Amino acid sequence: MEFGDGVSFAVVPTVFKREDYKRTKHDTVFSKWQVLIGSNDWEDFKNGKDGVGRYRVQNLPRKSCPGLYELGVAVIGQEQCRKLEPDIVLASYLGQAESVRSRLQRYGRSGAHLRNVNNLNDCETIESPVKAVTGGLFEDIFSKGGSILYRWAPMGSKREAEATEGMLLSTFDYAWNKGSNGERRQLDLLKKLGDREFMSKRKSGISRMLFPFLRNQVGIRIKGEKHVLKEERKLTCDVDEEKSNNFLTSILKLTRSRPQPVSDRFDEVDGSCSDIVCGVLLEDGGCCIRSPVKGRKRCIEHKGQRVCRVSPEKQTPPKSEIFTGQDHHNHKDSDVVCGVILPDMEPCNKRPVPGRKRCEDHKGMRINAFLFLLNQTDREKTVKDEKPDPESHTESIEEEALTRFCEATTKNGLPCTRSSPKGSKRCWQHKEKTSSDTSPVYFQPEAAKNVACGVKLGNGLICERSPVKGRKRCEEHKGMRIT
């Protein structure tokens, strides 16, 4: 600038020391401060402490994109671990990278180019690897109990990040940046980090916390990709919300699993008092109708037991499952019986095993299991022995039609049990066969009333031994088929 006497003066732009200002005009573009390396992370990792890494991977940016980043130092107390205030952070370095996430990872693993600098000896780069370990920038901060923090601002491209970095370096003097700012100021940074009076002045007053426009902001305004930071915050909030929901869910599960008070009293109720009963199946086939203990499903006698079968109505035992062609007046309808049709065409009236439908002799059998073991002669005789009721002639005709069988011999030697259509002796599959084809092959006439094993022997005869109870074959031929 020239004046009247021809004397010119150079206008030197104002350069602010970055660590002296906690609020800047470019704060709106940057993210919040995050811990990159704790004060003891490297030492704990070197000693093999469980669950400790060299740096905080969980605090890195979730997306990899070009941008600016600032490194800062701070002494973090236990009460400040969860929420970091910018008042305690001294910004010390500004950089740019094609991938900010990858650059921060290199800082966390080894300190990158900032670790190989001995700042206590004229800030010169050290060639010896032994001295580099003991005299780096990060180690000096760790010795004072400080931690390394970062914040970043995403940019559209690397060229845009380089241009913005040059603008900020011409406005601020970062203690760790070297070049246009001159030499690194590590000693100055360490002195301010340990100065309690200096750090106390940085804390915001109540008036500035309530009225942000009163805060002293310096520097220049820059542009950045703010939508990337919004997506980052959204992902972080979703993760935090999921963690809090899982924590609340675990608390609710814990409260629900607390034991309920149990009373030793129980009352016997009848069918009209209450619909809630114990329901455990008793040995006599009935169900326990006592009122359960308060807060439980069973009475005091059956606590902890499972229900094999519960009656749908109280004091009403299950209906009997009987397959029979005639009435049985010697049993009540409500009695539970086995119901398997015996060879003499009478149902088994034994009481079933508790929890099952059949008695001990016929367990696992179907109702008409013995019907397949009868030959043609036995079945004809049993059908003829059934005399129809003269008073209900129409019903007897229908029953006779239902009990008419095809009687053709199948490939395995057993008679066909399909019902033949009205006016025909054979079913639809065996209507071409004659009566000679349906003659029994493996039963002797004199053993018509007895159920035999029926397996063909080597000499051409048929085994006529009585089968084992509940099976089709004798003890010697059990599991064999008729060929």
From Swiss-Prot:
Record-linked InterPro entries: Effector_transcript
Statement: the UniProt record of this protein carries the keyword Repeat: yes
Record's compositionally biased regions (Basic and acidic residues): 380-396
Disruption phenotype: Reduced levels of lignin in leaves and stems. Reduced seed germination rate.
Localization per record: Cytoplasm; Nucleus
Keyword Iron-sulfur: no
Cx9Cx9RCx2HK repeat windows: 278-303, 338-363, 406-431, 453-478
Signal peptide: none
Expression across tissues: Expressed in vascular tissues of stems, hypocotyls, leaves and flowers. Expressed in the vascular bundles of xylem in shoot parenchyma cells. Expressed in the remnant cytoplasm of differentiated fiber cells and in protoxylem element of parenchymal cells.
Record key words, sorted: Cytoplasm, DNA-binding, Nucleus, Repeat, Transcription, Transcription regulation
Main location group: cytoplasm
Domain GIY-YIG: 64-112
GO biological process assignments: negative regulation of DNA-templated transcription; regulation of seed dormancy process; xylem development
GO molecular function terms noted in the UniProt entry: supercoiled DNA binding
An example Gene Ontology CC term for this record: nucleus
Region (Disordered): 380-399
Origin: domain of life: Eukaryota
Record remark: domains: Contains a bacterial GIY-YIG-like domain which can functionally replace the bacterial GIY-YIG domain in the UVRC protein.
Role played: Transcriptional regulator involved in the regulation of cell differentiation in meristems. Probably regulates the expression of various KNAT genes involved in the maintenance of the cells in an undifferentiated, merismastic state. Plays a role in the regulation of gibberellin 20 oxidase and the gibberellin-regulated protein GASA4. Localizes in the nucleus during the cellular differentiation state and may act via a single strand cutting domain. Transcriptional regulator required for the induction of dormancy during late seed development.
Name of the molecule in the record: Protein EFFECTOR OF TRANSCRIPTION 2
Source organism (scientific name): Arabidopsis thaliana (Mouse-ear cress)
Gene designation per UniProt: ET2
